[in-house]
Every structure is written in C-alpha cells, then in structure tokens.
C-alpha cells in the first residue's frame, strides 16, 4: 500500500483505509479479505502499533472501490435540484464527500430561503456555477493527491519527496483545497503550469 489512513473511532476501534494498485486487487479478494487487509497494515514498518492492528478482529465491512469522479454539468431541472452525491461526487482520495454535501445543502437552502422571502421563483444558477467551479478545483486536487499518494515505484517515491519539500518551502499548489476549501485558494493554485512546477523532476 502506498497510501493508508488509520482513524481511531474510540472504544479500541479503528477505521482503516488503504490504497493499492489494481494489479494487486487479488491480494484483497475472497472471503478472508478483511483479514488480508489487516495483515497488510501489520506489514507497514512505518505504522506505530502495527502489531496490535494485526492482532485485531475485523468487526465491520470491507468495501473496495476505484477512485474516480462523477458529475453532471447541470444538477437542476424544473422542480428538481440535486445535491451531494446525486449531483456528482469527487474522487474519495481527499475525503470531501460530506463537505461537498453540506456546502450544497447550505447554498440550496439559502437560495430557497431568499426566494421565499422575495416571493419569487428560486434561481439556482449561482449554485450550479459555484458547484461546477468547486468540483473542478477538487477534481484537480484529487488528481494531484492521487499522483503523489497512490502511484507506485521508485519514481513515484522520488516525486513525493520533491513535491513535499516544495510544499514545505511554500510553493503554491492545490493540496490545501481539501483542508480549507477550494474557494479559499487563488485560481492560479489550480493552473496546469502550477501543477507541472509542483510535480517536475
């Protein structure tokens, strides 16, 4: 696994996330796939308490899916407004699902409130435009995250190290979008030339 996350849940429970190459998916197939995942975490030398994770008992489901984006250009039609995953979702590598949904709810509810106050039909164009740009920025952020976190081999490791040093030195890039919100970064953080400079050899 090139990228993994461990989330303590309280009461001695953990939620584990791991990324693996499609070529390795058979390693996590079959009825014992949960035990295989726990075993993979146990082999991570960099993970504190890896032995304790290996000795744990799986209690939840094992879900595996490919990381990708899905969206529609206009999540509205007469009498209907789609929000959250129904309107399209971001590659889960940067964990934005709930944040996207909550922002959608806020924007749509404000439009509905304002239309009711003005006794007029709601105009969802601002929501459609804002969401399109937000999702575009998150799509770019997820693509960079995938390149840095989930590509495999020595070249990928070297690229991660270079990019990490550049980010630590203050070089502009899109990675903070998943922490502070994509709208809070300047537009140039998402320009192709910015990404190229961040990932360059």
Give each language-model segment a name.
Residues 1-63:
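Conserved FAD-binding catalytic core of PHBH/FMO-like flavoproteins
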Residues 27-35, 102, 124, 153, ...:
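Generic detection of long, well-ordered alpha-helical segments
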Residues 61-144, 148:
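Conserved mid-domain beta->alpha element of the FAD-binding
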Residues 110-201:
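C-terminal helical "tail/cap" subdomain of flavin- and related membrane-associated enzymes
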């Amino acid at each position: 696994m090139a990228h993994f996350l461990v989330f303590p849940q309280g009461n001695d429970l953990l939620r584990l996330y791991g990324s693996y190459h499609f070529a390795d998916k058979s390693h996590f197939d079959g009825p014992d796939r949960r035990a295989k995942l726990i075993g993979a975490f146990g082999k991570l030398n960099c993970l504190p308490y890896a032995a304790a994770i290996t000795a744990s008992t799986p209690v939840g489901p094992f879900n595996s899916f490919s990381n990708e984006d899905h969206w529609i250009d206009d999540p509205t039609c007469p009498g209907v407004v789609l929000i959250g995953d129904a309107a399209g979702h971001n590659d889960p590598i940067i964990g934005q699902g709930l944040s996207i949904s909550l922002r959608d709810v806020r924007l749509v509810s404000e439009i509905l409130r304002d239309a009711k106050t003005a006794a007029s039909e709601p105009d969802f164009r601002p929501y459609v435009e804002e969401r399109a740009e937000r999702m575009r920025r998150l799509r770019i952020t997820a693509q960079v995250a995938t390149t840095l976190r989930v590509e495999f081999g020595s070249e990928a490791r070297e690229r991660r190290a270079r990019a990490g040093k550049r980010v630590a030195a203050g070089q502009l890039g899109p990675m903070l979008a998943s922490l502070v919100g994509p709208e809070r970064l300047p537009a140039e953080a998402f320009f192709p030339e910015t990404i190229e400079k961040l990932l360059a050899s």
